[in-house]
Amino acid sequence: DALPILNAAKLAVADINAAGGLLGRSVELVDYDDALDTNQAVSIAEKLTTKDGVVAIVSGSYSGPTRVAAPIIQAAGIPMVSAYAVHPDVVNAGDYIFSQSFPGQVQGKAGAVLAVDKLGAKRISIIAVDLDYGSELAGTFEEYAKAHGAEIVSYDKVAMSDNEFTSIITKLKQDVKPDLIYMANYYAHASEVMKQCKTLGLDVPVVGTEGVDSWQFLETAGKNADGLYLTTNMDRDTKDENTQKFMKDYRATYNK
């Protein structure tokens, strides 16, 4: 999931250097993969702040690794911007830590407003990845939905490694009978959920989150993506020139 962030960072570095760099110097990009492992995240944060001599950091990792890295980066006095992490502890690490993503509480509530107030859902099933991301979004979604007349009729937590959802969707269709599914997960899970809903004939609205907002989802889901609603902070219809230029350059460079 971090690949789009790394690709975007490479584009930014290329643009900056083409314009003469920063303060007369070329920008160099150093990248590491924490593999969603908090121990690796700590090691990488320590290396970046003590050995690599970086002046700014962009995190394309999830909340768990970013939460443990943030205090180290804060203590070093180096600014960091998180692309994905939604847990409030990330930005609460200090005034050098920023996030461009929705806080989990905001996006979870937005999903519930869409599901309950706009789509009229009364019986909702939740499928959430068993990480900070899933628990933050699903928790806030559930709180708002219940307070506004909806019932959470099932709640399935899934591991990042899970890649088969036939049993869950079969249970929802035959026994639970929701009128909407809320997914607090990432594109690989969402692709399989949408596929199984279509295959098994569970024809209900599905509301996803920005973790699904990726060209990788469209590639893996194909026609099964039809009918999915998303809460996301990327407005592709905006007339903002910088955003439109970024999308044009990204597609031209990466064919995505």
Which residues make up each language-model segment?
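Beta-alpha junction/loop-to-helix N-cap segments that form part of ligand/metal-binding clefts
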Residues: 4-7, 19-91, 158-162, 186-189
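Second-shell loop/turn segments in exported
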Residues: 31-34, 55, 95-101, 129-131, ...
